[in-house]
């Protein structure tokens, strides 16, 4: 039994076959067509929204995309978490009143006010890390939450990889190589952790 098979069996043991069948490595439900690195070209359709969301090649690349997306929206919103979250949830037309933006955000999301208030509190307590974790909680069912949040190394790695701008076709494997071989590791908190069952050929 090779290393990859061992990992699959471990994931199935921890999370069950039904959960693993619905893991798309997209903890933030990033829409198809955003062209983030790590996208596989495949997608899944939201049962309630009917929208198409990207499948990523690893949880790390999905988390990287979430960090990049949130950082972009926070910059555009000048640090206003409420405004950034409205953009994240689809109420991104600056010409609309705040009431209309909430209404648009509610088109494909439940309890938008509660969602945003939890996000604001998480950001106040833990900054962008808390915000990302809260989004993962809001966007996923309990079992899928565990898949991401019970693996802090994936979150740490995704965050580190998020400092790099990468072409949309870049895989997790190649993203790790770019990070390891450049100046990123020394400037931004050390090397990213490799999966011992994969060969990244990175020194």
Name every feature range the model reports, one short phrase each.
Residues 6-16:
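Hydrophobic alpha-helical topogenic segments used for membrane insertion/localization
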Residues 15-202:
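Cell-wall polysaccharide-cleaving catalytic domain and substrate-binding groove, primarily
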């Amino acid at each position: 039994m090779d290393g990859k098979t061992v990992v699959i069996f471990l994931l199935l043991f921890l999370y069950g076959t039904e959960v693993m069948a619905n893991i798309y490595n997209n903890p933030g439900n990033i829409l198809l067509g955003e062209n983030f690195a790590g996208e596989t070209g495949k997608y899944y359709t939201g049962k309630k929204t009917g929208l198409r969301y990207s499948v990523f090649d690893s949880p790390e690349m999905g988390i990287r995309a979430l960090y990049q997306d949130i950082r972009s929206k926070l910059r555009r919103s000048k640090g206003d978490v409420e405004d950034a979250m409205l953009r994240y949830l689809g109420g991104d037309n600056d010409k609309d009143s705040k009431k209309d933006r909430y209404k648009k955000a509610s088109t494909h999301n439940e309890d938008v006010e509660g969602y945003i208030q939890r996000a604001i509190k998480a950001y106040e307590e833990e900054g962008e890390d808390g915000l990302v974790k809260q989004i993962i909680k809001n966007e996923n069912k309990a079992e899928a939450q565990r898949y991401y949040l019970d693996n802090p190394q994936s979150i740490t790695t995704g965050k580190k990889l998020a400092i790099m701008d990468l072409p949309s076709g870049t895989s997790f494997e190649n993203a790790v190589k770019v990070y390891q071989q450049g100046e990123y590791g020394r400037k931004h908190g050390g090397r990213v952790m490799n999966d011992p069952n994969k060969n990244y050929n990175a020194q």
